[in-house]
């Protein structure tokens, strides 16, 4: 991360992690690599503007039991997926004090996702699924807060975030399945609806160049509930 002007800094980052999803007999695990470029511009003490680009590559292993009438077959496959995201966010800083920060914000993001197809077999029949590429846009209106305090020699900040997110664009994931050579069917996933997100976390400044954070993220709408825990160790140089 470097300062390119009095009020602007830019940086690059790299990350790695794992993702696991389960739904009925379906399970997928992936190893994820993230790289990105970001920037921050402060407008006096009134507002801040974040912007950037993130690319994620996932190498996934999946399995499930496919059932067709009275037949069932256990299948495993591997594949790759790529996700590209461009984002921008503006936050108002006029409520901040030395004792706490409270920042309303509005953000926009564009997300492009593509993944490999896969084949499954049951009772001598083969079914091939090819997911369609997906372009999704997200708008977010929220508020975040932070309270700094000291814990021994470490400077610690307790953070919270609450937002409402609206999805538009390709809000239904689609794939085409070849039905054992007898035709092709269009498969649609559940449509993404407006979603509330909640974040709670704590971040400690371990040294001038190192920070450690632990956080929880939850997402909720009428049909979907998601929970996530994240530990983050960051070194600046």
Each model region followed by its residue ranges:
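Extracellular/periplasm-exposed beta-strand and loop segments of Gram-negative cell-envelope proteins
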Residues: 19-29, 57-85, 111-139, 167-179, ...
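Outer membrane beta-barrel transmembrane domains
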Residues: 10, 41, 121, 125-237
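Beta-strand segments within the central parallel beta-sheet cores of soluble alpha/beta enzyme folds
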Residues: 52-53, 103-106, 157-161
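Solvent-exposed flexible segments
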Residues: 90, 94, 102, 107-115
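Membrane-insertion modules used to breach or fuse lipid bilayers
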Residues: 6, 45, 49, 55-59, ...
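Outer membrane beta-barrel translocator domains of Type V secretion systems
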Residues: 1-97, 213, 217, 221-223, ...
């Amino acid at each position: 991360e470097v300062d390119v002007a009095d009020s602007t800094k830019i940086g690059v980052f790299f990350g790695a992690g794992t993702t696991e999803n389960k739904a009925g007999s379906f399970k997928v695990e992936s190893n994820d690599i993230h790289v990105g470029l970001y920037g921050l511009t402060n407008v006096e003490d009134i507002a801040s503007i974040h912007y950037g680009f993130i690319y994620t590559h996932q190498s996934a292993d999946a399995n499930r039991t496919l059932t067709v009438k009275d037949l069932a077959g256990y299948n495993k496959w591997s594949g790759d997926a790529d996700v590209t995201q461009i984002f921008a966010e503006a936050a108002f800083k006029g409520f901040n004090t030395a004792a706490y920060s409270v920042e309303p914000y509005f953000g926009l993001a564009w997300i492009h996702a593509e993944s490999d197809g896969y084949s499954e077999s049951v009772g001598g029949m083969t079914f091939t699924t090819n997911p369609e590429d997906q372009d999704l846009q997200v708008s977010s209106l929220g508020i975040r807060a932070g309270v700094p305090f000291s814990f021994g020699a470490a400077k610690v900040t307790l953070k919270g975030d609450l937002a409402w997110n609206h999805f538009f664009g390709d809000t239904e994931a689609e794939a085409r399945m070849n039905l054992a050579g007898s035709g092709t069917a269009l498969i649609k996933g559940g449509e993404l609806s407006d979603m509330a997100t909640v974040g709670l976390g704590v971040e400690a400044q371990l040294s001038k160049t190192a920070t450690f954070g632990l956080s929880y993220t939850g997402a909720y709408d009428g049909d979907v509930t998601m929970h996530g825990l994240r530990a983050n160790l960051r070194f600046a140089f």
